[in-house]
Amino acid sequence: MSGTQMSAFLRQYLADEDKKIRAQFKESDPNNKLILWMHEKTRITEEDLARPYTEDEVKELCLRTKVKVDMTAWNCLWEAKKRFEAKGRFVNKSERFINRMYMKAVRKKMVQPYPEEFVAQRREVVAAETKKHNISRLDRWRRKKTQNLSAQESSPARGAHASFIDAMQTNEVQVNANLSSVSQVNFQVEAMARPAVSSSDLSGIGDDEDEHQQSEFQDEHINCPETAINENSVRCDPINSGRMRTGCINSQGNNNTESDPDYYMFGTQLSSLLRPTSTQEPDDQVNCPETEMNESWVRCDQINSESMSIGPSIDSEGTITFQNSESEPIDVDSIA
């Protein structure tokens, strides 16, 4: 694509813009050096406009540029719309009413259309600025491509260096593994080379002298009087099925509190007294004849309902008798 020539209007326009910038930012001020340097880099020149585009550059620009159209530039109707919206004339109005208001604004010269010559000049300025911007973009893309090519060319050397480093690391790992295996083998050899324990070293263990000392130690702890249990406290006298010793009755009476009545003397709740109340395991209980029940009491076919329901009675002579004819009277004085 061939370049364009700069028109007189554009040359004058660029000269006026340069004067305005230099008048605002003096060269004598050191703080304005950066601004003036940027102005020189972005200023549009005749060489920029005369530079033609190649086919590759045009294709790249078309693929990487998003086209935008500004419909508000040099449009008198846009200016009329801003004025009407500021006054609130278009609130809840139809499109037909809005178009009639635009025509009325132009007819009454509220806004005037821009001249065609003015619009053409402004379009020329915008085209020059766009070409300057496209040239800057192409130069920037070209520099990036050059950097990428140089990086790809230097990448084989870097890859060789990286492979060399990886090889060195793998060699170090293999050497460490070999050293660990050798140390493990040496440890196993040392363990196998240790002298075994002979039968002569184990002599004296389990002899008669050791057994004699162990038996003496056990006898000392077993025959300790502090831990010994008196046989009299464990031994219990047998109980007759028809009679009971007063010692057991007294011990049962002592366990009862003042509020609890003597159920055994009055012959009530006899079954609850004879029922075992211990929650311990059978192996932990002591076999005491005084606390054991006769099998005849447990068997249901030999229990007399009258003897269980009716309790004993005491007469004036102090003799305990049962209403059941089969039971024998109990002499309280002889028991005491």
UniProtKB/Swiss-Prot annotation:
Main location group: nucleus
Cellular component, GO, one term: telomere cap complex
Impact noted for substituting residue 112 to L: In strain: North Carolina 29
Compartment(s) of residence: Nucleus; Chromosome, Telomere
Region (Required for binding to Su(var)205): 107-328
Keywords: Chromosome, DNA-binding, Nucleus, Repeat, Telomere
The protein's assembly and partners: Interacts (via C-terminus) with Su(var)205 dimer (via hinge and chromoshadow domain) and with moi to form the terminin, telomere-capping, complex. Interacts with HP6, which is also part of the terminin complex.
Record annotation: effect of changing residue 142 to Q: In strain: North Carolina 19, Zimbabwe 4 and Zimbabwe 70
Function: Binds to chromosome ends in a sequence-dependent manner and is required for telomere capping.
Range of residues in the leader sequence: none
Other facts: Multiple telomeric associations (TAs) in the same metaphase spread often result in multicentric linear chromosomes that resemble little 'trains' of chromosomes, hence the name 'caravaggio', an Italian train.
Name of the protein: Telomere-binding protein cav
Motif (Su(var)205-binding Pro-containing repeat 2): 289-295
Gene name in the database record: cav
Keyword Nucleus: yes
